[in-house]
Amino acid sequence: MILNPKHIKIQDFNYDLPDKRIAKFPLPVRDQSKLLLYQHGKVSEDIFTSLPSYINKGELMVFNNTKVIQARIHFRKETGALIEVFCLEPIEPTDYALNFQQTEHAAWLCLIGNLKKWKGELLSREMIVKGRLIKLTAERKEAVGTSHWVDFRWNNKKVTFADILEVFGELPIPPYLNRDTQESDKVTYQTVYSKIKGSVAAPTAGLHFTQRVLDALKEKGVDMEELTLHVGAGTFKPVKSEEIEGHEMHTEWISVSKSTIESLIHHGGKAIAVGTTSVRTLESLYHMGVTLILHPDASDEQLKVKQWQPYELPASAKDISSVDALQALLDYMNRHELDTLHSSTQIIIDPGYQYQVVKAMVTNFHQPQSTLLLLVSAFVQGDWHTIYDYALSHNFRFLSYGDSSFIIP
């Protein structure tokens, strides 16, 4: 076991990824992608439609039902300069659902493309929304780190901010695809079970699932639950520090229903996670429960999982089971009469991390020197090279629109 995960060198997680191995577009049929199987150190391959045959009746699979929003809005100044306003997370109001229902005004934390050309003047643009000509304006407020507070206003009480994004916005696709968003991406860059708007990137392991695969899982008797983690742009943030200690993880918002937590407890506190976002959410739930066991009166703020929290637990927390932690979380929800837990996580999963809830995962192939590759390495006790060497030598497609793997450590 690595004694101090903070001192892991990111260079140790590098590999050569030729550009031709990065899938620029998805396959015509989602579930015909290749599936790498890593089972207790042994590697083989199949196609994704066969996934249900590797999962036992009565096991629990957990999916992230977030939906990607059309977060990129372009404004052209009178000078001709193009400004991109990339919506990251809501500020006024901070609740995603409430913000999307706002009329006439909404405020978001945004990344600004071509910032030097935006001197602070009001940007505006007109488009037809619901049969009406709508003028949208954007006003840049104060900087928040590398982002900015942006006030959006529009001149119609019957048009919501969700409507605004649907018409004025463009779906953001990963920067490493090196291409413009196409109309087809509106369908192919969403999971078939996406429901809750808020992500600026798709939980891409889920892109392989079709209704046919979901039906096959159901017919086999596999239990399925959903949770929500809104994927932030930070998921593409490269690790620039030599050691992981110098990398600040992005915070992401999560929502988990009481019924999902009850189901997790019923399944012995163990689940198969679909995608790294589900992994991070499930493991964060464990650490929220641990916080409640150690501090029964913990506030909402104290429940939010911090980056290095899992590695700094007191000795008294080392033997807390996933069932006990999840039960503490369920008791907390019952006390506060909550049907859904809303919180956030900044968790980083490095080699040295002890997985508590996730017993298997479906995941795509990740970028070299990324925190997601660290997460996979932690899951297979450092054996990530076995997986990636096989994928590279057997013509697997990489990254968001690429193939996937099913990992049982």
Indicate where each model-derived feature is located.
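Surface-exposed, charge/polar-rich loops and edge strands
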Residues: 1-409
